[in-house]
Amino acid sequence: MWVEILVGSSAAIISGAAGYLLSKKIEKDKLKIYEEQARAKAKAIEHEAEKILQNAQVQVKEAELELKRDFEKKLEELKRDYEERFNELMEKEMSLKQMFKDELKHITLEKQEIKAEREEINRLKNEYEELKKRYQEKYQEVLEALQQQAGLTLEEAKNLILQKAEEESRLEIANIVRKYEEEAKREAKRRANYIIAQATTRFAGEFAAERLINTVSIPSEDIKGRIIGKEGRNIKTLEMLLGVDIIIDDTPNAIILSSFNLYRRAIATKVIELLVEDGRIQPSRIEEIYEKVKEEFDQQLLEEGENIVIDLGIGLIHPEIVKLIGRLKFRASYGQNALGHSLEVAHLAGIMAAEMGGDEVMAKRAGLLHDIGKALTHEYSGSHVDLGAEICKRYKEPDVVINAIYAHHGHEEPRSIEAAAVCAADTLSAARPGARREVLEAFLKRVQAIEEIALSKPGVKKAYAINAGREVRVIVNADLVNDNEAVLLAKEIAKDIETGVQYPGEIKVNVIRENRAIEYAR
């Protein structure tokens, strides 16, 4: 039994040893295979590296050759350019040398000519001195002989000759002057008649008479009561804001607005039309619509003025003056619309200036602006001439325009053809049959004078003459005029109107002082 165990153990040991040795041999064989594979890969890598290096060397050589070829090519081009430039400079140098030689030769010839001329001048000068000496000797001999024969001294003979020549010259000059004066007068009259005929036949103006009332149509009679408002609050607000007289009478479905100021009357008409259309007639709404309409009117005036300036082709004009041009539409003089009159004068003056050889565009510009001050006479005191000249000076209008403004009423003499043309055109436009009405203008001037007296007082914001000039409403600044001063102001204005304006009946002076306190609840 023990023998079997020993034999079995020995066999197991031998078997294990044989397996170990076999595994070692297998591992050794694998290691050898790996080493051979590694050597083969290393050799392949080395071969690839050598191949890459060879390719790189070839590329470097090709690049060197390319750079060398480019360098040689550029060098050749530079050399060729240099040679061309050098040849050009050489040619210029040769040309300049030749020019210098030619100029030097020319200067030498000129010097010779100058020398010869100087010698000739000296010779002639000597001859002149000799002749002068001989002439003086001869003159003295003749003079002495004449004095002996005439019994006069030299000075007496000179005076006698000069006196005779002066008398004859004066007579001849007087005849010539008289002749040309008569011809000039005839030609001037003929030319003036021709120019006026040309101007009047090439322009035909329209007559636009001024009215003092506007009628606003209303859908029903109950609107009249709403316009008046509770205790007359609405109509008082309207009249105070608009500066017109609102007449509500038995005329069916109509409200009459009366004012000599066309601008106020137009705004009032639009405001009442919008109020009637809106239906909300109350003081706050009245003020809101009034501000809106006034803003729209100002924009319309600017656009209308711009259109007129463009149509006349007179260049750029300051926007403030353009707005005043549009406002002339709502101003009249002796019943003649101021804007229509200014346009008429502009066209006539342009035609006349062109006929007389002046600047047609400048004459049109001066003609359009000659009465621009009339757009301001309702708001500021002073003549329309002074106001117009001041506004044009402020906005840098040309001197020709300012001179025309002063000259058309004789404040200055016209200093240019254009200013003279404006004066003549203004007279033509005003004198045209049917152009003006004197009675209406006298009334308008009286009403305007009443407003100007009120506006001239300190603290006065606005002044409106209403009721055909029988009442003036004066709105004062509550911060500058207190209640007691308002009473004194009314008396002072009334006294100035009595002394400064001629009027029938009596005029009511109504000074209004209103103080508002406004706050918002948020």
UniProtKB/Swiss-Prot annotation:
PROSITE patterns: HD. Gene3D superfamilies: Hypothetical protein af1432, K Homology domain, type 1. Residues 338-431 form the HD domain. The keyword Cell membrane applies. GO terms for molecular function: RNA binding; RNA endonuclease activity. It is an enzyme of class 3 (hydrolase). GO terms for cellular component: plasma membrane. It holds the Pfam family KH_1. SUPFAM superfamilies: Eukaryotic type KH-domain (KH-domain type I), HD-domain/PDEase-like. It is a single-pass membrane protein. The chain crosses the membrane at residues 2-22. Disulfide bonds: none annotated. Residues 212-278 form the KH domain. Keywords: Cell membrane, Endonuclease, Hydrolase, Membrane, Nuclease, RNA-binding, Transmembrane, Transmembrane helix. It is found in: Cell membrane. Signal peptide: none annotated. It comes from the Bacteria. GO terms for biological process: mRNA catabolic process. Its EC number is 3.1.-.-. Belongs to the RNase Y family. PANTHER family: RIBONUCLEASE Y (PTHR12826:SF15). Endoribonuclease that initiates mRNA decay. This is Ribonuclease Y. It comes from Nitratiruptor sp. (strain SB155-2). The lineage of its organism: Bacteria, Pseudomonadati, Campylobacterota, Epsilonproteobacteria, Nautiliales. The gene is rny.
